[in-house]
Amino acid sequence: VVTPRPLRLKAQIGASGKKSVAEILPVARIWVDTGVFHLDTPFDYWVPEVLSLLTVTGARVQVEFGNSFHEGIVLERTDSSPSMGNLKQILQVTSPNLVATPQTLELFALVATRWAGSPYDVIRSAIPSRVASVDKEPSAQHGKSSLRNPLSFLHSKTLVQKKIRAFWALPPATPRQRLVAELVAARYGLGQVLVIAPDERELNAIEQELATFLSPESIVRLDGGLSRIDRYRNFLRVVRQEADIILGLRGAVFAPLKEGATIIVMGESSQSLHEPRAPGWNARDVALLRSSEMNVNLILVGYSPSLEAARLIDTQWLTHISSKTKTNVVAMAPTMGELIPSSAFSIIRKALKVGPVLFLVPRKGYGNSVLCNKCRNIALCTCGGRLEQRGAQESPRCVLCRTPYEGWKCRWCQSSEIYLALRGIDRFSEEIGRSFPNFPIINSSGDHIAESVPTLPCLVIATPGAQPKSYVGYACVALLEGLRFFRVRRWAF
């Protein structure tokens, strides 16, 4: 017996009953999240009298666009529209809390124009999704916190000027998170401070350092590591001007700020500050845009400026603030292709008697390219991708289609001897461990990043940006295959 399928009827949507229109400023100009790229202009809607008090600039509303309902943000209220006879009414104000200020709405328009995108593509990165339970919470009052510890640093007086637009070159061999935290504490006395960090690990370290100066109530985080509820709650605090210090990742660069606030961008050349989704804005460039168009101070922080920042320094648009320091640097070149030059062994052994030694290597993995040991031809897969080896006992496999090659033989000379080029951190660990036996080895790269290292002598091997924190400092830092740090691979080989 065939079981009959349940009857499904088409939904019938009737025209909603029109409500009386507001007498004062009856038209609202709204950005609508249409999802259509070329429909990026504001649209006019009637404001019902019952929603007139809630329909203000920056309010989140629901409107009918075409035959479906869409979210929108109110830009302004006006008394007329070119299409007065064909306007639809706003359906509802979805949140009693404002999600944008006139300043941020202007910023959304500037960014959309500069990067040739839709304003709502920018808004998706700037404004978190609504949480109804948070909207019902009462606003909490937070007083301005005072510095708990006196500042122990003496930076350039330029850094504490009321008006500033500069690049601060950090001194080497100094914890950057500590320096940035001290800078935040110094600027905190002059007004609101927004810190943009390249990644969550950096953000956590700055928050930890700031805890020595300020109470946690003064610090608000805006990043994807928070829960959906906490992020929306913190965002509303920022919109209400209840946050004195804001910490966030690239999306926080759109946070509403008070007049005269300071934006601090860490690692301004980092790829993490680029938004991968359309329209592809960059947090550093958005901060530069805010500084040029609005009353906002800007400090870019890093060890050396990027080409873009260097150009602004050359044109004197940015002030370059240098840091005087002296670091003992020794450059040594291998003579026979060895990993560590023989002349460096004595320096490293001497440093291991004092504390941990850090080896910075350019790549993760084991052998990132397989070559024939006899003819030195590159081993390729049938799909055209190069072969890699992920361990000493593993067979080569393709980096693109993951096809394994057990019993690999060179297609040119039929030799089965493998030469591993482009050594990764795992291969470095093997060779360094043999060179300096009886010392513990700590690897830090990729998904396995060590937060800190012990104070005892040990070998720490890390890729750039993954180096663990040493509370006593590293006795020596060795950059292996230094030229590789400046090479960017743009192709499959």
Each model region followed by its residue ranges:
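Conserved RecA-like helicase motor-core motifs
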Residues: 214-226, 383, 388-390, 437-447
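Conserved two-lobed SF2 helicase motor
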Residues: 236-257, 445, 452-469
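N-terminal cationic and glycine-rich segments that engage phosphates or anionic surfaces
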Residues: 347
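Cys/His-rich short segments
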Residues: 353-434
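Conserved phosphate-handling catalytic cores of large alpha/beta enzymes
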Residues: 489-493
